[in-house]
Amino acid sequence: MTALRLLADTFFLTKACRYMDLQPQLILELATLGICTGFLAGLLGIGGGMVMVPFLTFMLSLRGVDPDLTVKMAIATSMATIIFTSISSVRAHHKRGAVRWDLVKGLAPGIVLGSMIGSMGVFAWLKGSYLAIFFGLFVGFSATQMFLDKKPAPSRQVPGTAGLMGAGSAIGFLSGLVGAGGGFISVPFMAWCNVAIHNAVATSAALGFPIAVANVLGYVVSGMSVEGLPADAFGFIWVPALVVIAACSVFTAPLGAKAAHMLPVKKLKRIFGSVLYVLAIYMFYKGIMH
């Protein structure tokens, strides 16, 4: 069954790439990015967005896209791929019984609300350079929290309905501004509430789906009236990148999810923090230079 699926996806990917007239080098670059981000999505529960946004920003810049639009397109495209990687990785986590579905149900309504406000309002209004700086600063802060490894008070528990609604709104809103699956906020939040890190990562992967769907709708609607976008864009989404990355990442996301359950907690947190630090520095630099 897996072989048939791989064959079908390869056929679809080949046809799609020919239709979009993609250069072999670009296909290879996007495929490599998809393989890496898919693995990270499963491993860290971050949807791969923290890695994808900086690289897509760089690739779009090389293609001569308006500097103010490169970051927005990278963020929107990254979020669109999370629809596929979240499904793939959460299945692997669910088989291990690691997903806290009670938290998913509690956070999802707020996530949808926050995502729509962010992607349809603030995202379209902010300049790309401001988004890049915000991305760098916030991700750097999240990385610092992971390295500090502060122990939450033993008595602290997951908040009630209103608290989860508020937390979900913040996760959805901020995720929409940086194109990530919410793991950079939801994982530290759940750890702060004494949820085990492996459960937090698995639950974050499940939250990636409602985050991605709500934000993608907003990116498409808000981007339809924007001038200067490439012909192969759908709203703010760069369609060729979405097709190639999604087709490749769905195979490596389960591998990352498997690795997440084999690594010790401290090492997992350090991997998470290290990835975020490197990419935060790049995006902060990108925002300052433009």
Which ranges hold each PLM region?
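Juxtamembrane transmembrane-helix boundary motif
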Residues: 3-44, 51, 57-72, 86-171, ...
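Short helix-coil transition sites and intra-membrane helix breaks within transmembrane domains
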Residues: 41-50, 175-183
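Membrane-interface helix-entry/capping residues at the boundaries of transmembrane alpha-helices
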Residues: 75, 201-204, 272
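Short hydrophobic/aromatic, small-residue-rich stretches within specific transmembrane helices
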Residues: 78-82, 204, 241-242, 246
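Accessory recognition modules or surfaces
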Residues: 158, 177, 183, 209-213
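Hydrophobic, aromatic-rich membrane-embedded alpha-helical segments
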Residues: 166-189
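Short, structured loop/turn "capping" segments at alpha-beta junctions
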Residues: 184-185, 196-199
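Hydrophobic alpha-helical transmembrane segments of multi-pass integral membrane proteins
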Residues: 202-220
